[in-house]
């Protein structure tokens, strides 16, 4: 007989034994690791289709949930045009990007009630950009006592909610703001 994984059993065992859970569940990581490598730019293709993680599209830019988030609610805002450096972004595009960043921060704040945010850009691979060829802004909600130290000590991220559930919460706040 095959026993199915039951998170409730593990939680009860951890409480009973005064131990911590030993499983970090991130099923989307294996999807990323095992999928065929795509040579196209994800930030160029995502807004052209019906990507379910897209939160909002504007004339010059779009907001999308990060497929590999640092924390629950980690969003990205990128220009529609393929540019690798902030210096290549026009003033008009930059204004629209910042306006959308503000809108996403507000929606995430209402949907998730974080204690703060990290908002920023990693320009170039040496600066930590996972997708260095297309400029984008990270919006990372933070909570007091969150586990954001995990990437530093074990290259792990703890995400407590399915990404599409989080996306729906944020999208609901965006549609309510209009």
Each predicted region: which residue ranges?
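HIT superfamily nucleotide-processing domains
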Residues: 1-178
């Amino acid at each position: 007989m095959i026993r199915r994984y039951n998170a409730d059993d593990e939680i009860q065992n951890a409480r009973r034994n005064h131990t911590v859970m030993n499983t970090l569940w991130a099923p989307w990581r294996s999807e990323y690791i095992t999928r065929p490598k795509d040579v196209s730019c994800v930030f160029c293709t995502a807004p052209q289709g019906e990507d379910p993680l897209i939160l909002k599209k504007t004339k010059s830019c779009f907001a999308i949930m990060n497929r590999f988030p640092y924390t629950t609610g980690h969003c990205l805002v990128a220009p529609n045009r393929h540019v690798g450096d902030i210096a290549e972004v026009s003033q008009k595009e930059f204004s629209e990007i910042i306006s959308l960043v503000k809108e996403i921060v507000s929606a995430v704040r209402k949907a998730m009630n974080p204690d703060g945010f990290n908002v920023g850009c990693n320009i170039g691979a040496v600066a930590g950009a996972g997708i260095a060829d297309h400029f984008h802004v990270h919006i990372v909600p933070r909570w007091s006592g969150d586990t954001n130290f995990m990437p530093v000590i074990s290259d792990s991220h703890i995400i407590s909610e399915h990404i599409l559930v989080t996306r729906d919460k944020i999208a609901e706040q965006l549609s309510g703001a209009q």
